[in-house]
Swiss-Prot record:
It holds the Pfam family BpsA_C. It comes from Methanocaldococcus jannaschii (strain ATCC 43067 / DSM 2661 / JAL-1 / JCM 10045 / NBRC 100440). Gene3D superfamilies: Vaccinia Virus protein VP39, Winged helix-like DNA-binding domain superfamily/Winged helix DNA-binding domain. One of its GO terms (biological process) is polyamine biosynthetic process. It is an enzyme of class 2 (transferase). It is found in: Cytoplasm. Keywords: Cytoplasm, Polyamine biosynthesis, Transferase. The gene is bpsA. This is N(4)-bis(aminopropyl)spermidine synthase. Belongs to the branched-chain polyamine synthase family. Pathway: Amine and polyamine biosynthesis.
Amino acid sequence: MERILEKVRAKSEIPVYDKSIENVLSAILTTNDFWKIVDLSEEPLPLVADIIRILEEEGLVKISNGIEFTEKGNEFIKSYGIGAKDNSVCECCEGRGVSLKNYQDLLERFKEIVKNRPMPKHEYDQGFVTPECTISRIALMNSRGDLFNKDVLVLGDDDLTSIALMLSNLPKKIVVVDIDDRLINFIKEVAEQLNYKNIEVITLDLRKPLPEKYSRAFDTFITDPPETVYAVKTFIGRGISALKGERRAGYFGITRRESSLDKWREIQRTLINDFNVVITDIIRNFNHYVNWGYEEETRAWKLAPVKKKPEDIWYKSYMFRIETLKDSRGFEEEVDVGDELYNDAESSTT
């Protein structure tokens, strides 16, 4: 194992541990599909690709239509006592911990409306979750007392959470901020069709600060930032600066597919030390992203050892809920970065 670890460290920019390699080996015991190996191992995709290449060099796996152990590889995993991944998840809620029993009508109406939604745009690192995930977000936020009669800010709305919020009739007011005019226009059209008046929709690149009128104006925000430290600080910082004060809430997703645990630690330090907020919830694989259709344009495709489009959902993120306290503060400065907003060594969907 030590030899493999050293070879991966020499090859990869991403922090790697023996546990990283064990996770990938365990995932390969479960599936030969590269995308599912990334999903099950919960290691950043570029690192998984590097590990698999080293395993191939060492004669432990063979790569053809899938990734499979050689005889030498099978002996190796037996000698280290590595078993297959056990992915036992509740079949009712898919591990989210919320019930959609009282939200079935909302779910069906949402599905119908978003059939004609704009498709994800690679330029903006877009991707959207399943309708069940979007409505589960509504259920989660409502269960925490963060929606009813509240002013809600949506920072980036690939998932059309604002439409689900309108259909729920729970918030007092909704404000949507997005860089993509296609999404902005679609949300406006739906608001007109629903005759929903309590919504504002603005086009803004979040590298720039929010308009001053949105400072300390909201009870709740939700966002789904790109997963560079720059982007996390910017998107979440903007959300915190828009909250009215203490004991207000923010929601966002962070993956293990594009963020190592080292990056998670940096993100959590930013949340706790810089923003002075409390992390109240982290729900594993809450968000399931529909395969976005531009896979062949991404870094993930270039790195994938098997050039085969994913057949199942593999890209998932953990849902974070944070809450502000007396000394919490956000981030309001303009960010002067380009591609670094979307890309770092662990990125793969850009």
